[in-house]
Amino acid sequence: DNYLEELKENGEESNPEHLCEEIVKMNIFNSVFVDCTASPDVAALYETLMNNNVSVVAANKEAASSSYDNYTKLKETARHRDIKFLFETNVGAGLPIINTMNDLINSGDHILKLEAVLSGTLNYIFNTISADIPFSEAIHMAKEAGYAEPDPRIDLSGKDVIRKLVILAREAGYPVEQADVKRNLVHPGKVLRGFP
């Protein structure tokens, strides 16, 4: 009942770096770090964790869509350390898309083309807009329904789709960067000023 008081008295301030230090210090065999954030600061810890034999499972798209050099470094570290770097939930809402692609490539197939709806948010918004429901209201509805990122500008700017495209292309064997993705934005930038 008095957890807040106890936390204030006995708790300690934390940050991602401190968390990483504590995990490494524990040195538990077969440790797995699960990142359910969207934080670049947390994603920046993966290399340190992996170099200390901690597997990483990430819903966070930051690492897998970061620079190609960082992405390949993380994949190589996982391979070299015989640990896991998994990010299946980065695309397809957890459907086994990345695993299936890896199975195809490992069996000698080459992925030449992917077709996908890469944004549930944009799909929801475009299916909701009508004469009665303006764009701005559809955005709010998507957010309330749990489709949109906490900051819908990430969806509307195309950033989330670009990250997913980069991750899928890399897993298909193509060394792409986010800057390589051609952008056809569906909104003028000034539309986003009123959000989140």
Locations of the language-model features?
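N-terminal glycine-/serine-/threonine-rich beta1-alpha1-beta2 phosphate-ribose binding loop
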Residues: D1-N51
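A generic secondary-structure micro-motif detector
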Residues: V34-C36, A64, T128, D155
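Rossmann-fold NAD(P)-binding glycine/threonine-rich loop
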Residues: S39-N52, K61-T89, A93-L104
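Rossmann-like NAD(P)H-binding beta-loop-alpha module
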Residues: R79-D82, L86-A145, K159, I167
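Substrate-binding/catalytic subdomain of NAD(P)-dependent oxidoreductase enzymes
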Residues: T128-I129, E137-P196
